[in-house]
Amino acid sequence: MSDEGKKRSSRADSLEAEPPLPPPPPPPPPGESVLVPTSPRYRPPLPAPLERIVGSGEPPVELAPRRKGAGEPLPPLPPSLLPGDQEVTAAGDSCEGPRRLPEVKLPEAATGKGSPGEPEAGACREGERRGTGDQPETRSVCSSRSSSSGGGSDQRSGHQHQHHQPICKICFQGAEQGELLNPCRCDGSVRYTHQLCLLKWISERGSWTCELCCYRYHVTAIKMKQPCQWQSISITLVEKVQMIAVILGSLFLIASVTWLLWSAFSPYAVWQRKDILFQICYGMYGFMDLVCIGLIVHEGAAVYRVFKRWRAVNLHWDVLNYDKATDIEESSRGESSTSRTLWLPLSALRNRNLVHPTQLTSPRFQCGYVLLHLFNRMRAHEDVSEDNGSGEVVMRVTSV
């Protein structure tokens, strides 16, 4: 019984502690609709506002509290996002009209050194600080671009300078590979050459004249190389046969002439000179000696060219630069090896018996006249009266 009494007394105390219920709302006036209360809709809570990072000397800024219910209005927007004269509608279920949000005034420490009414100035200063912080990167990019553009211009100027630099006409290298010489009359891009390149070209070609301007190089032999430094040259099969023929002919000629002289003047060969068989041998040996002499003369030029090539390889040479005054003097004396031009009328080619190689008085131009004669024979099938107009033909003849 005591427990039941205690429960009843506690219930009575709780009923007394509860506030009284509010009175029902008065009925609406006639002619208006009755508002039926509805249960509030569920709205998720808003995320927590970001905390503003404040310096050590700045006071903390009061942040707006979180919204606790659907009937509570939204917190005001920061001044940087919403001007002071903009109106927004509170997101609630109270069906209220548009409401002007109160302006939040930030302290001077948060906005900078300006007045409280200048929040945008602080943002501008902050942007300026960010801009000044980004300046080194921009400057580095610009400097890298300028350096790259400067490097490109330097590279182009270097290519142009290298293009205008004199180069060797054999190896196409510049003066860094050696001293460049001007050994002949050639001009332009084929004017210069290296000493070693030209000597190697002369040794391979076997000629002391330029293949372009036909100028004979002025070279001086310094000394012969040591025997251990001698180099072999490349020769063809025909040149090998010519060399063997000249060597064998020379050996036979030396042996034959030596025996003939001993038989003719030695007192120990008196009986040989009186014998008829030895007299026949003398005639045969004399004929063979003449054949050997002709063979040596005929093939000696080729062997001499091979010897000159070998000598050019195994000698220390010094090529001299082209001297125009010396060239003019040689040309005036007729010692120049340049090509000559013959101007002949075109009607001379129509006459078959006008020019003949046997009528030449100077053997230096025989090659050119032979070419003219062959060209005349090739035109034999053409009609002579077909073209009676006057004209000229230019034939370039090189002295051999």
Swiss-Prot record:
Keywords: Cytoplasmic vesicle, Membrane, Metal-binding, Transferase, Transmembrane, Transmembrane helix, Ubl conjugation pathway, Zinc, Zinc-finger. Residues 19-31 have a biased composition (Pro residues). Residues 1-14, 96-106, 123-132 have a biased composition (Basic and acidic residues). Residues 1-160 are annotated as: Disordered. Zn(2+) 2 binds at residues 184, 186, 210, 213. InterPro entries: MARCHF11_RING_CH-C4HC3 (IPR047906), MARCHF4/9/11 (IPR046356), Znf_RING-CH (IPR011016), Znf_RING/FYVE/PHD (IPR013083). GO terms for biological process: protein ubiquitination. It holds the Pfam family RINGv. A motif (PDZ-binding) lies at residues 397-400. A motif (YXXL motif) lies at residues 369-372. Pathway: Protein modification; protein ubiquitination. One of its GO terms (cellular component) is cytoplasmic vesicle membrane. The chain crosses the membrane at residues 243-263, 276-296. One of its GO terms (molecular function) is zinc ion binding. Its EC number is 2.3.2.27. The keyword ATP-binding does not apply. A zinc finger (RING-CH-type) spans 160-220. It catalyses: S-ubiquitinyl-[E2 ubiquitin-conjugating enzyme]-L-cysteine + [acceptor protein]-L-lysine = [E2 ubiquitin-conjugating enzyme]-L-cysteine + N(6)-ubiquitinyl-[acceptor protein]-L-lysine. It is a multi-pass membrane protein. Zn(2+) 1 binds at residues 168, 171, 194, 197. It is found in: Cytoplasmic vesicle membrane. E3 ubiquitin-protein ligase that mediates polyubiquitination of CD4. E3 ubiquitin ligases accept ubiquitin from an E2 ubiquitin-conjugating enzyme in the form of a thioester and then directly transfer the ubiquitin to targeted substrates. May play a role in ubuquitin-dependent protein sorting in developmenting spermatids. Interacts (YXXL motif) with AP1M1. Interacts (via PDZ-binding motif) with LIN7A. Interacts with unidentified fucose glycoproteins. The RING-CH-type zinc finger domain is required for E3 ligase activity. This is E3 ubiquitin-protein ligase MARCHF11. It comes from Mus musculus. The gene is Marchf11.
